[in-house]
Amino acid sequence: MGKVDTNKKLKENSLLKTAFEFFTTKGFSKTSITDIVSKAGVAKGTFYLYFKDKYDIRNKLISHKSSQLFKKAIADLGDKLDALPFEEKIIKVSDHIINQLNENQSLLTFISKNLSWGVFKTAITSPVSDDDVDFSSIYEKLLSEAPKGIKDPEIMLFMIIELVSSTCYSAILYKEPCSLEKLKPYLYNNIRMMIAQHEGNTK
């Protein structure tokens, strides 16, 4: 990467980092582009070289932060995943991500408040940063390891994400309807049932 490209990447990363700080402290609706560029130390015109508007930088942040969560889960679990059956791989990765969010509740709040299926679908197909994981290829590899095949995998993934996002948000932040640790066995049994509903020949 040349010096010009390096400088561009540094400016983009600075804008992303600054926007995340504002969104998780001041709130998305109360944060302006002027706030972001002033703290990042760049001109407003520079912002528009990288992002269309405030919604665009928010969506790219969700994509980037989600990728980082997934990347860390895969890296930390490593070879432990290889010996597990398909459904247990999904649960192990989910558990690791949930634990990360439990340790970073501002990130949990940001993602849960702003995550939509459209944003997530864009995230898994269009990595923001060069070091973001290619989620779609990893997910396709996981699906290929399901011994019975998976029918409508996009619906299955949507339902798992919605379930995990909504239930863990309440359990982590408000201990409702119970603590996270008490919730986990019920959550993972439901994920197993969801996967079982989608098992079958895909052809």
Task: Locate each region found by the language model.
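N-terminal intrinsically disordered/low-complexity leader segments
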Residues: 1-10, 199-203
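N-terminal positioning helix adjacent to the helix-turn-helix/winged-helix DNA-binding module
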Residues: 4, 10-14, 18, 156
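Helix-turn-helix
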Residues: 14, 22-56, 60
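Alpha-helical DNA-contacting segments of helix-turn-helix folds
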Residues: 51, 58-72, 111, 131
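Hydrophobic alpha-helical connector segments
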Residues: 60, 74-103, 157-160
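Amphipathic alpha-helical segments used for helix-helix packing
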Residues: 96-122, 169-173
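Amphipathic alpha-helical packing segments from all-alpha helical-bundle domains
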Residues: 119-147, 154-158, 185
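Hydrophobic/aromatic-rich alpha-helical bundle segments in the mid-to-C-terminal region
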Residues: 144-190, 201-203
